[in-house]
Curated annotation (Swiss-Prot):
The keyword Aminoacyl-tRNA synthetase does not apply. This is Exodeoxyribonuclease 7 small subunit. Its EC number is 3.1.11.6. GO terms for cellular component: cytosol; exodeoxyribonuclease VII complex. The lineage of its organism: Bacteria, Pseudomonadati, Pseudomonadota, Alphaproteobacteria, Rickettsiales. Keywords: Cytoplasm, Exonuclease, Hydrolase, Nuclease. It is an enzyme of class 3 (hydrolase). HAMAP family: Exonuc_7_S (MF_00337). It holds the Pfam family Exonuc_VII_S.
Length: 80
């Protein structure tokens, strides 16, 4: 776990969520000193924001796909 001000750009949603869950467990169980807990909390905020961004991107992509799927062209046969 790195406590940088930014996350690695290539961290997946699943990896970020797993790390966030581990941080929450450690803080809830009081397994860390106050200073370490504060650093973990800061990292947790970065992870939460990253997860929210990934979810928003996925939602927008799904909406775009759905719009494309719903706007298919239907050809009707006409008599000539």
């Amino acid at each position: 776990m790195t406590n940088t001000k930014t996350l690695e750009a290539n961290i997946s949603f699943e990896e970020a969520l797993k790390e966030l869950e581990e941080i929450v467990k450690k803080i809830d169980n009081g397994q860390e000193s106050l200073e370490t807990a504060v650093k973990s909390f800061e990292r947790g905020i970065l992870l939460k924001n990253h997860c929210e961004k990934k979810l928003k991107e996925a939602r927008l992509k799904i909406e775009k796909i759905t719009k494309l799927a719903n706007s298919t062209v239907v050809l009707e046969e006409t008599e000539v």
